[in-house]
């Protein structure tokens, strides 16, 4: 007579069922994550397109206004900058306590740390106070993009995490206005309503020493040195650092 089949232990059956359920849950999670990333990719593309059109329209309007002013023999008054990019170019040696405190407030604790700040009156006063230790100016859209794409790191659970995909950004900010890196670029470059949220959600950018080296750190930029306000010329400096 054939031997009777020995039934599997109940614990083994439960383990097998649990493993099947885990596999199915994992498969569903992977599928859901893939679908979310696909949807987010489409959203990011459409928003990037919208922002690009807005940037081009703004630039075209400025070009027209400059031409009209020139044709009438007038001087076109450029709008005041709303944002500044600030890079620390000197170390800690011989820094006065008050200046050290200001550098800490604007998160420039190390040499070649860089931040993007709203250029209001209090910030202008702080920048003047620590001017011998910084190079700053008015960033172009290309510079803001370069900083975020190449050197951007988010604050996630106290850790410094490199920006690698838009899902990181969506999960970090949990805000429908900030779901992709182009949203971050737009909020910063246009000084949007979430400017502070975005900048505070990132670590200061850590840049490299400029290719070709510095000129004279202890002399003002207008005197052939390095420190101080470079206005739009800061972009050429940062290209060498990013």
Task: Write out the residue ranges for each language-model feature.
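Core subunits and conserved enzymes of cellular information-processing
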Residues: 1-242
């Amino acid at each position: 007579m054939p031997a009777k089949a020995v039934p599997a232990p109940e614990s083994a059956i439960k383990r097998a069922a649990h493993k099947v359920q885990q596999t199915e849950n994992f498969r569903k999670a992977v599928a859901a994550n893939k679908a979310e990333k696909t949807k987010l990719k489409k959203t990011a593309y459409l928003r990037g397109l919208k922002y690009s059109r807005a940037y081009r329209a703004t630039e075209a309007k400025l070009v027209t206004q400059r031409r009209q002013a020139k044709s009438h023999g007038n001087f076109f008054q450029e709008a005041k900058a709303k944002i500044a990019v600030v890079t620390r170019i000197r170390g800690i040696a011989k820094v006065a306590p008050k200046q050290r405190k200001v550098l800490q407030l604007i998160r420039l604790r190390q040499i070649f740390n860089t931040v993007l700040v709203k250029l209001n009156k209090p910030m202008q006063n702080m920048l003047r106070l620590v001017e011998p230790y910084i190079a700053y100016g008015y960033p172009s859209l290309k510079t803001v993009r370069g900083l975020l794409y190449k050197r951007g790191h988010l604050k996630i659970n106290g850790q410094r995490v490199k920006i690698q995909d838009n899902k990181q950004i969506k999960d970090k900010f949990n805000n429908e206005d900030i779901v992709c890196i182009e949203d971050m670029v737009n909020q910063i470059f246009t000084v949007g309503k979430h400017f502070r949220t975005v900048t505070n959600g990132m670590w200061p950018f850590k840049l490299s020493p400029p290719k070709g080296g510095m000129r004279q750190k202890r002399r003002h930029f207008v005197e052939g040195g390095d420190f101080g306000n470079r206005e739009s010329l800061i972009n050429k400096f940062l290209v060498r650092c990013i």
